[in-house]
């Protein structure tokens, strides 16, 4: 999957945190669906509480909890810092990252 650093940089600087997280989750889902079309990524939000990202095929298999501050700090850190944080946590939980054509994974790993 290909990704545009210019567009992502613009989003990181100009979109509110929750919308940016939703964009990142959608990008992660698109990448996962290149490996298996049944992957789904869900972001649950509740004001004042951490964000919960659940990734599943048929049943939930990976969960990533991020505070609003973690999301905001990584959004400010760089256009792909939040993606990197999520992918690294997925690897810690046992997800195997597959080779894919395109530059997205090169940006985040």
Set out the residue ranges of the language-model regions:
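Amphipathic alpha-helical interaction modules
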Residues: 29-66
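A short, charged
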Residues: 84-109
């Amino acid at each position: 999957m290909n990704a545009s650093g210019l567009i992502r940089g613009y989003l990181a600087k100009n979109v509110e945190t929750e919308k940016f997280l939703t964009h990142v989750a959608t990008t992660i889902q698109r990448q996962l669906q290149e490996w298996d079309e049944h992957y789904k990524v869900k972001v649950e939000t509740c004001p004042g509480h951490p964000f919960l990202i659940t990734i599943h095929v048929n049943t939930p298999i990976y969960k990533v909890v991020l505070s609003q501050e973690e999301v905001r700090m990584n959004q400010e850190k760089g256009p792909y810092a939040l993606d990197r944080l999520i992918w690294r946590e997925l690897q810690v939980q046992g997800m195997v990252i597959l080779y894919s054509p395109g530059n997205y994974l090169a940006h985040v790993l």
